[in-house]
Amino acid sequence: MFDGSNLGRNTIAMVLAGGKGERLMPLTLRRAKPSVTFGGKYKIIDFVLSNLFNSGIRRMYILTQYRAYSLNKHIRESWGKWTGLGEFCVAISPETSSDSEQWFKGTADAILQYLRFVETADADYVAVFGGDHIYKMDVTQMIQFHRMNRADLTIASLEVPKEEASRFGVFSVDDDNRVTAFTEKPKDPETIPGRETCFASMGNYIFPTRKLIEVLLEGKKHYEDLDFGKHVIPMMLEKGDRIYAYNFNDNLVPGMKSEERGYWKDVGTLDSYYEANMDLIHVSPQLNLYNYKWPILTNQGNLPPAKTVFDEEGRRGVNIDSYVTGGCITSGSTVRRSILGPMCKINSYSLVEDSILFEGVTVGRHVKIKKAIIDKGVVIPDGAEIGCNHEDDIKNGYTITESGIVVVPRKDR
């Protein structure tokens, strides 16, 4: 784990975690997108928080909003124990804080509503990061770049294909990586000269504390729905402020192989979420969760080890090319190319293939599950088939994605 530095200690983080994640429905029906499970045991929010923590940035405010209960609970139970004297990881939301009586109207408005935490932080820098992406990053390298360029704002950037760029803030830079133009989610994105790709914002920013306070108070005078991409960045460019783009591909965390750098996933749709999870079960995935020098932290819980039972012809408990977390029991069944969240039980004579099972899923006997996402606590009855016949799946009320993934939601309680 990175030991931290003065840069980390002189920085506070404001993590934006209030998004609805509508394209992930029905997984976000009862939880915010950052609270969705990833990789069996983690929450999406754990990745940005681990990056900040491992970078030595251990004063973190997580700004939550939509269906915040489960996310706030996760922050409290999983992250409170990692902090030491003078450190904190606190979730705050309009419904739980007396400081704010209204919902966030924009990304910058979310910071503005809690500006007093920035003003009293005694920090040189503020890291404003999104809470709903999957990646590893040493944030202090970005802060060093920011300092070297004496920037008023540094934007973490990556190259994306032109056909995907309309989902991002897109910008142009000069030879020194200084931003010369910026457009939020353009219909016809400007490509990098000589390429079919665009420079896109990751939604991660480094500000000097005084500059952030200044631009937010100024922006408040003009925009009620103050947003970094729509308002703050264009406003700063117009004033001639020094805005620089930090190339995320240059970032290399301790223990990371060169071929692993540059991994960043939005997981904003059910198909992209499924694909990113399935990447983990490859022999050498680009996102290496076994890099103990840069761990992804979460609430481990007091779970027993996973186990397989029965070794009879036709009733053999096996997990093949799969990612199986604590407390799971594969009982006389086959799990192949799948991810099992904590405390799943797969009963005899069943097959789970190319699927993601959330925590506490119970699969009955003689069940077939193929290319599916099963939400938390779902009980699959004996003899059921999921992903084998989409007409039947639709009749059962399941969601079918464009690529044919079947999503089984939690039952109403």
UniProtKB/Swiss-Prot annotation:
It catalyses: alpha-D-glucose 1-phosphate + ATP + H(+) = ADP-alpha-D-glucose + diphosphate. Disulfide bonds: none annotated. InterPro entries: ADP-Glc_PPase, ADP_Glu_pyroP_CS, GlgC_bac, GlmU/GlgC-like_hexapep, NTP_transferase_dom, Nucleotide-diphossugar_trans, Trimer_LpxA-like_sf. It is an enzyme of class 2 (transferase). Pfam families: Hexapep_GlmU, NTP_transferase. Keywords: ATP-binding, Carbohydrate metabolism, Glycogen biosynthesis, Glycogen metabolism, Nucleotide-binding, Nucleotidyltransferase, Transferase. Its EC number is 2.7.7.27. Pathway: Glycan biosynthesis; glycogen biosynthesis. It comes from the Bacteria. One of its GO terms (molecular function) is glucose-1-phosphate adenylyltransferase activity. Alpha-D-glucose 1-phosphate binds at residues 169, 184-185, 201. SUPFAM superfamilies: Nucleotide-diphospho-sugar transferases, Trimeric LpxA-like enzymes. CDD domains: ADP_Glucose_PP, LbH_G1P_AT_C. GO terms for biological process: glycogen biosynthetic process. NCBIfam families: glgC, PRK00725.1, PRK00844.1. HAMAP family: GlgC. Belongs to the bacterial/plant glucose-1-phosphate adenylyltransferase family. Involved in the biosynthesis of ADP-glucose, a building block required for the elongation reactions to produce glycogen. Catalyzes the reaction between ATP and alpha-D-glucose 1-phosphate (G1P) to produce pyrophosphate and ADP-Glc. PANTHER family: GLUCOSE-1-PHOSPHATE ADENYLYLTRANSFERASE, GLUCOSE-1-PHOSPHATE ADENYLYLTRANSFERASE-RELATED. Homotetramer. This is Glucose-1-phosphate adenylyltransferase. The lineage of its organism: Bacteria, Pseudomonadati, Thermodesulfobacteriota, Desulfuromonadia, Geobacterales. The gene is glgC.
